[in-house]
From Swiss-Prot:
Annotated source species: Streptococcus pyogenes serotype M6 (strain ATCC BAA-946 / MGAS10394)
Requisite cofactors: Zn(2+)
Active site, renumbered: E144
Protein name, per record: Protease HtpX homolog
Gene name in the database record: htpX
GO CC, one annotated term: plasma membrane
Cofactor: record remark: Binds 1 zinc ion per subunit.
Length: 298
C-alpha cells in the first residue's frame, strides 16, 4: 500500500505537469493568434518565456531562501539532536548531508530547500524542536529529506515559474488587445466567418481564465508533493506513527510570527500563515486530517 501510494502521487504530478505545459502552449497560441495572427510564434514564445522563468528560479540561492525566512545556520555543537536526526535521515535516503538551519519562532514548522540534493538545506522552528519528541522529529525531518530526495523543490519551482509565465503572457496579451493591438487580419477583414468568431472568443476566454487555471494546477502539484513526502517519510523511518503523531501536533500549531510570502509558504510542512476558510483547491497544503487518514490507511 505504501509503495502504491508513492507511485500514484508521482504519476499524479507527471499528469499535472503535462497539463501545465499544455496550458502554457494554449495561452501562447491564443496570444499569438490574437496579436500576431500566428499560432506557432505565440506558442514558441510562451514556451521560451516559461523555460527562462523556470531556469532563473531553480538556481535561486539556498542561502537567500533561508535569509528570507529568518533562518540561521547551526552546527552540530549548537543543535546536536536536530543535527543528528537530519544526518541519520540523509544517510537512510542516500543523499548528501544538507545544511541545517533554525528559525526562532514558537510555531511548529519546518521546510527544505535546494534545487538538488547537493545544495539542499533543512530548517526547523525552535517551537518544533522544543515540542516534538525524537519519534515525531524523525517523521518531520524524514518528510523534508524526502522533498530533497524526490526533487520536490525543483518541481514546485517549475510549477511556480510556469504559473508566473502564464500570468505574464495573459496580462501582456490582454493589455495589448485593450490598447488597440491585435493582428491586422482581425482588425481589417470584417470577416463574419463563424469559425473565426468562435476561435476569437475561445482565444479571449483562454487569456482570461488561464491565470486562474495555472494557479489551481500549481497548488494541486504542491498538495500532491506533500502527500508524497508524507508517504516517503514513512518509507525512510519505517514508522507511520511518528509521522501521524507529528501531524496531529502540527494541526494545533499557531501561524508563524514573521511574514511568509507565497513561494516560501509552499515549502513548509504545515501552512505557516493563518488558515483560510475558502476551498482547499486554493491551498498550498492538503488538509492535515486527510494527510493523517492516508497514513493510517497504508
Amino acid at each position: 500500500m505504501l509503495y502504491q501510494q508513492i507511485s500514484q502521487n508521482k504519476q499524479g504530478t507527471v499528469v499535472l505537469l503535462v497539463v501545465f505545459f499544455a496550458l502554457l502552449a494554449l495561452i501562447g497560441a491564443s496570444a499569438g493568434y490574437l496579436l500576431l495572427d500566428n499560432y506557432a510564434m505565440g506558442l514558441v514564445l510562451a514556451l521560451v518565456i516559461g523555460v527562462i522563468y523556470a531556469t532563473s528560479m531553480i538556481f535561486q540561492s539556498t542561502s537567500l531562501v533561508m535569509s528570507m525566512n529568518n533562518a540561521r545556520e547551526v552546527t552540530e555543537k549548537e543543535a546536536p539532536g536536530f543535527f543528528h536526526i537530519v544526518e541519520d535521515m540523509a544517510m537512510v535516503a542516500q543523499i548528501p548531508m544538507p545544511r541545517v538551519f533554525i528559525i526562532e519562532d514558537p510555531s511548529l514548522n519546518a521546510f527544505a530547500t535546494g534545487s538538488s540534493p547537493q545544495n539542499a538545506a533543512v530548517a526547523a522552528t525552535t517551537g518544533l524542536l522544543e515540542v516534538m519528541n525524537r519519534e515525531e522529529l524523525e517523521g518531520v525531518i524524514g518528510h523534508e529529506i524526502s522533498h530533497i530526495r524526490n526533487y520536490d523543490i525543483r518541481i514546485s519551482t517549475i510549477a511556480v515559474a510556469l504559473a508566473s509565465a502564464v500570468t505574464v503572457i495573459s496580462s501582456i496579451g490582454g493589455r495589448m488587445l485593450w490598447y488597440g493591438g491585435g493582428s491586422r487580419r482581425q482588425r481589417d477583414d470584417g470577416d463574419d466567418d463563424v469559425l473565426r468568431i468562435i476561435t476569437l472568443l475561445l482565444s479571449l476566454l483562454s487569456l482570461l481564465l488561464a491565470p486562474l487555471v495555472a494557479s489551481l494546477i500549481q497548488l494541486a502539484i504542491s498538495r500532491q508533493r506533500e502527500y508524497l513526502a508524507d508517504a516517503s517519510s514513512v518509507e525512510l523511518t519505517r514508522n507511520p506513527q511518528g509521522m501521524i503523531k507529528a501531524l496531529e501536533k502540527l494541526q494545533l500549531s499557531q501561524p508563524m510570527k514573521h511574514p511568509v510570502d507565497d513561494a516560501s509558504a509552499a515549502l513548509y510542512i504545515n501552512e505557516p500563515r493563518k488558515k483560510r476558510s475558502f476551498s482547499s483547491l486554493f491551498s498550498t497544503h492538503p488538509p492535515i486530517e486527510e494527510r493523517i487518514e492516508r497514513l493510517k490507511n497504508m
